[in-house]
Amino acid sequence: MLEQLYDSLVNAPVVKRGDYSYFIHPVSDGVPLLEPSLLEEISECILCYADMDVDRIVTVEAMGIPVATCLSLKTGIPLSIVRKRKYDLAGEIELSQSTGYSKGKLYVNGISEGDRVLIVDDVISTGGTLLVLVKALEDAGIKISDVVAVIERGTGSNDLRDAGIDVKTLVRVEVDDDRVVVEEVYSDNE
């Protein structure tokens, strides 16, 4: 399982920005090309791995949208996209986001107290976005049934677990100089 994701990661280009090495990948960046077969493989794995007994699928714009949309289409579960733009709708939840590389506000709409949600993201690196999202939703009376990210890089998922948030990832990677090293791949035997 996840052969295409594995192959696409180990062949992903790496670019240097200052002292930090970024891998460029279709799931995290939308370039060079996000193949439907890759989305299919990822979504099928998440369907086997995640608690899908939920009222809503939630993702943060922008790159969580393709995977979350695929899951929504496969399951018929409505999708709520956490936006970087305020809409001033009734019940809108505002949260302050801080990651290793940006700060800003995020806005949640279309979710109500008592809803059960699956949160889906493309990459966890620092875990900052998911931490504030989970806490804000819980404070609003929303039950987090599961949190799944496609790619894990860095210590963010460990930091989330230390904060009491059980997060699942499909692959764990690190960047070693100019290449992506896949350290762990989800197995359906887990």
From Swiss-Prot:
Gene3D superfamilies in alphabetical order:
3.40.50.2020
What reaction(s) does this enzyme catalyze?
A: IMP + diphosphate = hypoxanthine + 5-phospho-alpha-D-ribose 1-diphosphate; GMP + diphosphate = guanine + 5-phospho-alpha-D-ribose 1-diphosphate
GO MF annotation terms: guanine phosphoribosyltransferase activity; hypoxanthine phosphoribosyltransferase activity
Q: What's the top EC group for this one?
A: transferase
Q: Where in the cell is it found?
A: Cytoplasm
The pathway where this protein functions is:
Purine metabolism; IMP biosynthesis via salvage pathway; IMP from hypoxanthine: step 1/1
Mind naming one GO cellular-component term on file for this protein? cytoplasm
The principal location of this protein is cytoplasm
Keywords in UniProt for this one?
Cytoplasm, Glycosyltransferase, Purine salvage, Transferase
Biological process terms from the Gene Ontology for this record are:
IMP salvage; purine ribonucleoside salvage
In Pfam terms, one family for this protein is Pribosyltran
Its EC number is 2.4.2.8
The protein's matches in PANTHER family, at most eight in alphabetical order, are given as: HYPOXANTHINE/GUANINE PHOSPHORIBOSYLTRANSFERASE, XANTHINE PHOSPHORIBOSYLTRANSFERASE
**Family stated for the protein in its record:** Belongs to the purine/pyrimidine phosphoribosyltransferase family. Archaeal HPRT subfamily.
**What is the role of the protein in this entry?**
Catalyzes a salvage reaction resulting in the formation of IMP that is energically less costly than de novo synthesis.
Subunit (UniProt): Homodimer.
What is the name of this protein? Hypoxanthine/guanine phosphoribosyltransferase
Q: What is the lineage of its organism?
A: Archaea, Methanobacteriati, Methanobacteriota, Stenosarchaea group, Methanomicrobia
